[in-house]
From Swiss-Prot:
Reactions this protein catalyses: cytidine(1402) in 16S rRNA + S-adenosyl-L-methionine = N(4)-methylcytidine(1402) in 16S rRNA + S-adenosyl-L-homocysteine + H(+)
Keyword rRNA processing among UniProt keywords: yes
Regions crossing the membrane: none
Function: Specifically methylates the N4 position of cytidine in position 1402 (C1402) of 16S rRNA.
Higher taxonomy: Bacteria, Pseudomonadati, Pseudomonadota, Alphaproteobacteria, Rickettsiales
Family note: Belongs to the methyltransferase superfamily. RsmH family.
One record GO biological process: rRNA base methylation
Keyword NADP among UniProt keywords: no
Subcellular location per the Swiss-Prot or TrEMBL entry: Cytoplasm
Name the UniProt record assigns to this protein: Ribosomal RNA small subunit methyltransferase H
Residues bound to S-adenosyl-L-methionine: 31-33, 49, 76, 97, 104
Source organism per UniProt: Anaplasma marginale (strain St. Maries)
Amino acid sequence: MVHKPVLLNEVVEALSPKDGSVYVDATFGGGGYSRRILETAQCVVYAIDQDVVVKKYFDELLQSFPGRLNLAISRFSKLREVVLSFGVDKVDGVVFDLGTSAMQLADASRGFSFMNSGSLDMRMCSSALRDAAMFVNTVPEKEMADVIYQYGGERYSRRVARAIIDARRKCRINNTGDLATIIRSAVPRSRVHPIDPATRTFQAIRIWVNNELEELQAGLETAAEVLKIGGKILVTSFHSLEDRVVKHKFRSLCDMGFSLINKKAIMPTDEEVKNNPRSRSGKLRAIARVE
């Protein structure tokens, strides 16, 4: 399954790639953002992704843009080191497309989705020390409930944590299918919001496993450090926690020589939502360095 980048037209319009410029695609994934940027101008893109699986998509895209595309398998928090490793000090723009890709969700062995039972993994980086199995089988009940509430917004977080603890006392929880069943037993289905009861808890576990909010904060800080005057940072987020981090960081940057490109987040059009339902929750925020 190929990942469809959300708000792609809006991102490229706001970024406005120029010939001779240098950009960072901080979430390469399937290469959707990188491809459009490279098609728009005779520029160079330095791509970053912590998932080694993306090398396949990078190799394919590199054939179309030899000498203009580079990849580093790394994290947001290492963005500055990555840029310097390519012999560059400052760049003209950095783009982030947050969350999981369609390829990650479609691969049951990665454990990101409960649609098909698979390993309790959820690691964006295969060398990371903690995974979803560690969370559900070792984390204490109170900490588990707090994570599920804070990162997933799950109002029944304590019931979910209790159900997981009770289940793991009987036997180790080994796959996403079993975990989803346990969660569903603790969360009543809503008639108003008919999403799967496991959705919020799976999101919370994924954020915990990958330290996502801290990585995002660090990524935004380092992106600001490597930006030229006139350069831009663009972030597409998919849930309120991500958007809050972006909004607060951008607000603080406005006191440090930056200016918001759009005062309000840009949302996908009705047509995009129709063609790509995943885009429904997407929000694009953009900021430029002016001094």
